[in-house]
């Protein structure tokens, strides 16, 4: 089970949004590279990065910040935001990104996901961000008419490494992860699922480690780490103890 600390990039800075709204962004660190180093020093083993500007623009917009982070941390980094074609997938993987996350294109162009997953086994994840049960696209600005499960099922045999499932209604609000919806998705598919959106406290980490969540790969922590509601040492100690058990 992995706890992924999140770095969301907007204008080269490390921010957190509320419910995916770019107008409701809080800057937590002007230097994302320093933030990445801090997470590494705290003992995290896998970093989750999102290029928010890229998600809206449909192409990478914070490449310089991402590349700077890759130079200072040795842990694997997964990256989403603005990855809409195979050339971008290939470019990021060649620069040292461990795993790319395809979101909007997974809805609009499922063939891209299948092609990328086939070309780069184990290095392509799908990001499914749901609002009222339906998947949102274009940096969450638009809602589709399909559910997360419907899209996830399209990729069952495609070699997708993970599904990152976000409940937009909870994202950035510290209301706790929507475990019921996340676990229901994980139980309905064979692809590992990563929980995202609203992780609020150590209670969410305990929920992630509970027997009913055994099909998950882990969860993403954002605002709770930045504002001190989640103690990294306590969270990582719990995960370590669960691993050793």
Curated annotation (Swiss-Prot):
EC number of the protein: 5.3.1.16
Gene3D superfamilies: Aldolase class I
Top-rank taxon, per record: Bacteria
Keyword annotations of the record: Amino-acid biosynthesis, Cytoplasm, Histidine biosynthesis, Isomerase
GO terms of molecular function: 1-(5-phosphoribosyl)-5-[(5-phosphoribosylamino)methylideneamino]imidazole-4-carboxamide isomerase activity
Known pathway: Amino-acid biosynthesis; L-histidine biosynthesis; L-histidine from 5-phospho-alpha-D-ribose 1-diphosphate: step 4/9
Cellular compartments per GO CC: cytoplasm
Localization per Swiss-Prot or TrEMBL: Cytoplasm
Gene Ontology process terms (BP): L-histidine biosynthetic process; L-tryptophan biosynthetic process
Reaction(s) the record says it catalyses: 1-(5-phospho-beta-D-ribosyl)-5-[(5-phospho-beta-D-ribosylamino)methylideneamino]imidazole-4-carboxamide = 5-[(5-phospho-1-deoxy-D-ribulos-1-ylimino)methylamino]-1-(5-phospho-beta-D-ribosyl)imidazole-4-carboxamide
Entry annotation: catalytic residues: 8, 129
Family designation: Belongs to the HisA/HisF family.
NCBIfam families: 1-(5-phosphoribosyl)-5-[(5-phosphoribosylamino)methylideneamino]imidazole-4-carboxamide isomerase (TIGR00007), PRK13585.1 (NF010112)
HAMAP family: HisA
Name of this protein: 1-(5-phosphoribosyl)-5-[(5-phosphoribosylamino)methylideneamino] imidazole-4-carboxamide isomerase
Source species of the chain: Rhodopseudomonas palustris (strain HaA2)
